């Protein structure tokens, strides 16, 4: 992938950009095999990759510069701003949005937040695009609601320029820290969720719900999990750390009982909406802590699917699963180091199958799907 920002030494986020994709995949595979070297693996499936550029469905832009000349991108460690509107990881459809946002920031009088001076209002612009219909969700992260009335007043101009903006919100993040969003979300549009569709499964994206940033690879990850589950004698499963329900909604069949657990209420609202659309009545989604939910249950289903954040599922949940011993565990991980650590805490299981998904090209990161079977 060619990147003018990298060539000019202005951005180093894609540390592996100079390596061809096959080399990157090979290095990631070696890393994963090293991490799982202590465990016999029955089957290594071929790694899955997607496009090497234009694949991201989300942009998280720090807003800096002045109200007349805002910059959208990032801040270097020394505080120097860098405009990343031309980043080749973004699809071409993002360019007109960035182009319209710059004059809009001036029109609405949204002074970019100055970290050094602790002054200004507009901290971040968060943009998400649906692959299914090209609809977009735009979030303005502000320090306070001081400029809210001005923003509302100027908004019709932006909506006229960009009819693809289906969901527009303001998020209030008052803390002087590099935290992307606060708890308060104010909707400026009637529509509150973005419709997405992977493998004929309807999914919804709401402002404060996590959603994978590489749809081409994520859709293959969900489809693979579905294929693996279809091969197992399973009538009841849990989907822990389920997010908007991507795994559970793909794996569920009309006669399967499935419980999805996720701590974020916004994500659970999305999952419930999808389940209703699919007419799946035996699916239950609840906004709870996954570990607390699981460890309070007196029995387990045949299959427990986990998709934890980078820290992994942790010892308490590993101990519980070891004791209760479900027949199958499917572990989807964005951090193979913590996954390997967790598998060590599950001594009664063998690794049936492993597959690497290159969700983050040009970096050392990857996603991995592992099927564990009770010995």
UniProtKB/Swiss-Prot annotation:
Offer an example of a GO molecular function term for this protein.
4 iron, 4 sulfur cluster binding
Which range is the signal sequence, renumbered to this chain? none
Q: Which residues bind [4Fe-4S] cluster?
A: 3, 11, 14, 87
Superkingdom of origin: Bacteria
Catalysed reaction(s) here are: uridine(747) in 23S rRNA + S-adenosyl-L-methionine = 5-methyluridine(747) in 23S rRNA + S-adenosyl-L-homocysteine + H(+)
GO BP field: rRNA base methylation
Alphabetically list the UniProt keywords: 4Fe-4S, Iron, Iron-sulfur, Metal-binding, Methyltransferase, rRNA processing, S-adenosyl-L-methionine, Transferase
Indicate the residues that form the catalytic site. Answer: 334
Query: What job does this protein perform?
Result: Catalyzes the formation of 5-methyl-uridine at position 747 (m5U747) in 23S rRNA.
Output this protein's name.
23S rRNA (uracil(747)-C(5))-methyltransferase RlmC
Species assigned in the record: Escherichia coli O1:K1 / APEC
